[in-house]
């Protein structure tokens, strides 16, 4: 990249980047030492602005549609050159990082940013290796220019901003976007395309490990509890959002955490609270007059975030790796108040619910989404990030579960006693007690009750959980109303699942509409 008049900061330290971000007016320092940055009107991902370059090497393997939208190679080249030229006379920040904490499955990536704070984010969220690219793999390039304004008529984009992935050239272009989450999710999408070809399942999940070396995975959309539940003071964290499951073990795709901050409290989330300090980027968080962050304030967005390196977490797996999981938890946030707090799934039910990805958008991470909580089906609990057809990932999950014998659970972190607005949301201590029972193997072989309409098996008792909560009908005053809502939910599952071509054993593992 041309750089005639200004310096380029290569592999800058955390302190250097914070110093530069402050001197350049990119952010402010909080009382707890974190750097606060604002992202303007885009406070979440922009799915309508995300594209994949259509080229012969990957075209046949991508599930083209509203999520994976095609972009012309020649138009991409022109835009990349235009952005490169725009950055040519600017002070730049460049780091050599890696994505994937596995010596075989990592991808080397050179990240170039226009701002110091985006570079700090990249160094917090990606892996800063002791030796860059030890296996001498071809290097990916990320070019991040938030100050560049796209012109759709000229650049072929949807708006004034864009995210474009080019598999053939190993390039990711981010232009006109300040929201830093786009950077991490673009490389997640890259790994989600590359890993299945090697027999590795990429997952939108968090992971932690117990003292005995037992790994647990938590799948779920943003706001359903992935980060909160994996940040367990009694267990060692592997990572909070993106992992690969290979034969023999699980590895983190990242080197940091990107935790939601809305209503963050020291009491309920001590691990995250303590991780927010010097070196952390707080995105769209407001402060009081004493520079103390106000995590209750959603003026800027419900999607306020903290980006910090894994080193900020005391109890963690330093090598970012774990054994294959003995327990897999699908986190669903049920706004209808129909699903039980926990169900024990068969292998076929696991495939059904993995493909369905039923949950809710909570404090949505996407631009243009209403702030209201709404139910959604998100394939693999992360539809926006998976370039291949859903069946590829479901098949890999089934293989991994079968070969290792992992037990899968469906845990509802949403509502009970009625839908959102009438019922109440399961509190964090209740969900934690359920997760404790799962990781301690207390639910293996327990007596269960079958909920026919939902086709789910629920335990009759769990230590530390009020028994009344376990069968959701018991928490509804109006039982007929519950039956009505359960029927509606079963129908929506069936309707959504009709698009999948899968064996009957999986098709019949869902609710009975």
UniProtKB/Swiss-Prot annotation:
Residues binding ATP: 185, 204, 220-228, 269, 305, 431
EC category: lyase
Keywords linked to the UniProt accession: ATP-binding, Cytoplasm, Decarboxylase, Gluconeogenesis, Lyase, Manganese, Metal-binding, Nucleotide-binding
Cofactor: Mn(2+)
Disulfide bond annotation, renumbered to this chain: none
Catalytic activity reported: oxaloacetate + ATP = phosphoenolpyruvate + ADP + CO2
GO BP annotation list: gluconeogenesis
Family matches, as CDD domains: PEPCK_ATP (cd00484)
GO cellular component term of the entry, any: cytosol
Binding site for Mn(2+): 185, 204, 241
Residues given in the record as substrate binding sites: 45, 179, 185, 305
SUPFAM superfamilies, per the entry: PEP carboxykinase N-terminal domain, PEP carboxykinase-like
Note accompanying the cofactor annotation: Binds 1 Mn(2+) ion per subunit.
Presence of keyword Mitochondrion: no
Keyword ATP-binding: yes
Coiled-coil features, chain-numbered ranges: none
Pathway, per record: Carbohydrate biosynthesis; gluconeogenesis
One Gene Ontology MF term: metal ion binding
Localization terms from the record: Cytoplasm
EC number: 4.1.1.49
Quaternary organization: Monomer.
Similarity section: Belongs to the phosphoenolpyruvate carboxykinase (ATP) family.
Function: Involved in the gluconeogenesis. Catalyzes the conversion of oxaloacetate (OAA) to phosphoenolpyruvate (PEP) through direct phosphoryl transfer between the nucleoside triphosphate and OAA.
The name this protein goes by in its record: Phosphoenolpyruvate carboxykinase (ATP)
Native source species: Shewanella sediminis (strain HAW-EB3)
Primary gene name: pckA
């Amino acid at each position: 990249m041309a750089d005639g008049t200004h310096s380029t900061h290569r592999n800058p330290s955390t302190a250097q980047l914070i110093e530069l971000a402050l001197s350049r007016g990119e952010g402010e320092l909080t009382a707890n030492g974190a750097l606060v940055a604002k992202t303007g009107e885009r406070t979440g991902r922009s799915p309508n602005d995300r594209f994949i370059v259509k080229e012969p090497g990957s075209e046949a393997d991508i599930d083209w549609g509203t999520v994976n939208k095609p972009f012309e190679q020649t138009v991409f080249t022109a835009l990349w050159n235009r952005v490169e030229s725009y950055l040519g006379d600017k002070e730049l920040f460049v780091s050599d990082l890696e994505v994937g904490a596995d010596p075989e499955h990592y991808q080397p990536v050179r990240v170039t940013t226009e701002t110091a704070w985006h570079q700090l984010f990249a160094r917090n969220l990606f892996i800063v290796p002791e030796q860059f690219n030890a296996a001498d793999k071809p290097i990916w390039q990320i070019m991040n220019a938030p100050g560049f304004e796209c012109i759709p008529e000229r650049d072929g984009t949807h708006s004034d901003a864009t995210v474009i992935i080019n598999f053939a050239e190993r390039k990711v272009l981010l232009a006109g976007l300040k929201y830093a989450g786009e950077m991490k999710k673009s490389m997640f999408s890259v790994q989600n395309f590359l890993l299945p070809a090697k027999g590795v399942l990429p997952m939108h999940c968090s992971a932690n490990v117990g003292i005995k070396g037992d790994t647990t995975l938590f799948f779920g959309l943003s706001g359903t509890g992935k980060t909160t539940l994996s940040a367990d003071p009694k267990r060692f964290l592997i990572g909070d959002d993106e992992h690969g499951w290979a034969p023999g073990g699980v590895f983190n795709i990242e080197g940091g955490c990107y935790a939601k901050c809305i209503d963050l409290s020291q009491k309920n989330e001590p691990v995250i609270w303590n991780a927010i300090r010097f070196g952390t980027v707080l995105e769209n968080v407001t402060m009081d007059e004493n520079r103390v962050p106000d995590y209750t304030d959603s003026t800027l967005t419900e999607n306020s975030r903290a980006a910090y390196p894994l080193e900020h977490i005391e109890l963690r797996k330093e090598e970012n790796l774990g054994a294959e999981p003995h327990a897999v938890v699908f986190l669903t946030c049920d706004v209808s108040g129909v699903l039980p707090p926990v169900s024990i799934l068969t292998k076929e039910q696991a495939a059904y619910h993995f493909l369905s990805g039923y949950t809710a958008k909570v404090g949505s991470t996407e631009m243009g989404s209403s702030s209201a909580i709404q139910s959604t089906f998100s394939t693999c609990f992360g539809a926006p990030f998976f370039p291949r057809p859903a069946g590829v990932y479901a098949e890999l999950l089934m293989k991994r579960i079968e070969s290792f014998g992992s037990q899968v659970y469906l845990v509802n972190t949403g509502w009970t006693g009625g839908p959102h607005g009438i019922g109440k949301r399961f509190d964090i201590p209740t969900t934690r007690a359920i997760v404790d029972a799962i990781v301690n193997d207390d639910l293996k072989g327990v007596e269960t009750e079958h909920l026919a309409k939902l086709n789910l098996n629920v335990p009759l008792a769990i230590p530390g959980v009020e028994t009344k909560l376990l069968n959701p009908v018991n928490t509804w005053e109006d039982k007929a109303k519950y039956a009505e809502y359960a029927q509606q939910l079963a129908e929506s599952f069936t309707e959504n699942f009709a698009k999948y071509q899968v064996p009957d054993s999986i098709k019949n593992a869902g609710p009975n509409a």
